[in-house]
């Protein structure tokens, strides 16, 4: 659906969160264009700044592609001032070729904890926790520190904790 809608746009942009990092490479491949990941600054419509080497250096990336597929680091831009209005909402018709799929629901995880991607403190566990019950130890520590809870991919894959807690790659 997004690839079809992208015909009318020069830039396809997503947050550099788990969803965006999963979706945008597929869109870029379908559009036969490069993806520019994790930008922190827009220099020009075709030029972007992004961190490299774990944030120890920066690369200026210039794209010659007609379509730009870009993910933006969520905390890299200051919030803009609200002008009191809102953008119009346009309904997108995916067309008959997508009629075989049906959106059922989206489940959002509600938590009183800080969001994992922006938390100041994260308490994390891995496969060494050996079970989901042992993650309660991390939960009590995170409560005292007002921290987010993280988990390694191995712990998530083992079913010790849900995948919305996964940190790293």
What do the predicted segments below correspond to?
Residues 1-169:
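N-terminal glycine-rich FAD/FM-binding segment characteristic of electron-transfer flavoproteins
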């Amino acid at each position: 659906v997004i690839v079809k809608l992208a015909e009318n746009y020069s830039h396809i942009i997503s947050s550099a969160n788990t969803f965006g990092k999963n979706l945008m490479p597929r869109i870029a491949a379908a559009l036969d264009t490069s993806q520019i990941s994790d930008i922190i600054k827009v220099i020009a419509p075709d030029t972007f700044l992004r961190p490299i080497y774990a944030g120890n250096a920066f690369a200026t990336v210039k794209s010659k592609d007609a379509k730009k597929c870009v993910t933006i680091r969520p905390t890299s831009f200051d919030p803009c001032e609200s002008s009191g209005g809102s953008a119009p909402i346009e309904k997108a018709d995916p067309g008959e070729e997508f009629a075989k799929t049906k959106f059922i629901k989206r489940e959002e995880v509600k938590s009183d904890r800080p969001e994992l991607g922006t938390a100041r403190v994260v308490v994390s566990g891995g496969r060494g926790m050996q079970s989901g019950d042992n993650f309660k130890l991390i939960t009590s520590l995170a409560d005292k520190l007002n921290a987010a809870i993280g988990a390694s991919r191995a712990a998530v894959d083992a079913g010790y904790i849900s995948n919305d807690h996964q940190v790293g790659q």
